[in-house]
A protein has these predicted regions:
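Alpha-helical transmembrane segments and their immediate juxtamembrane cytosolic regions
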Residues: 1-170
Length: 170
């Protein structure tokens, strides 16, 4: 059952990044949107930490996915407001580093960048999802080294891409 919910989370995370990029242009107030993301990030942080609580002691488990989406939203704002490639690259790199304290560290900002790059092209969108799935599998494979046998690790990495892969198909 836990694997089922993990796969739902895998499906949801990449889907949220995709819809964040796709819906950005339709947002009437970028400031209000950012404030809503921040509000939901703050509201959901305690339940997020409680979900990972062990031995009845609440601890900080990093920032939840809503904070990650806020960082990704910042990437969209910078890419919209500046054409300076150095500034865009610097902010994207800063965002990826900042995401290390969040759920879906590194991956969500990279997914967002892929979807920005692919905007308007069905071929590029498909390629972006394929790259995202391969990146996710590589991260899971690397994370299992030393924790699982090679066979178990490969099976886990392949199983973990079901959710992200379905997101690209749907």
């Amino acid at each position: 059952l836990s694997e089922f919910f993990l796969d739902i989370g895998y499906f949801t995370a990449i889907t949220m990044c995709y819809f964040l990029v796709e819906g950005y242009q339709y947002t009437h107030s970028k400031k209000a949107y950012a404030l809503r993301l921040l509000s939901f990030a703050l509201i959901s942080e305690v339940p997020y930490c409680l979900a990972f609580t062990q031995d009845g002691i609440i601890g900080f488990e990093g920032l939840n996915m809503m904070f990650t989406l806020l960082i990704c939203f910042g990437i969209l704002v910078v890419f919209e407001r500046t054409s300076n490639k150095v500034l865009r690259f610097t902010y994207a790199l800063f965002s990826i580093i900042l995401s290390l304290f969040c759920s879906w560290a590194i991956l969500a900002p990279v997914f967002t960048l892929l979807f920005i790059w692919s905007k308007g092209s069905d071929k590029k969108i498909k390629l972006s999802f394929i790259i995202a799935v391969l990146l996710f599998a590589a991260f899971n494979l690397a994370g299992g080294i030393g924790r699982f046998s090679m066979t178990t690790n490969i099976l886990y990495a392949l199983g973990s891409i079901v959710g992200t892969g379905l997101s690209g198909i749907v």
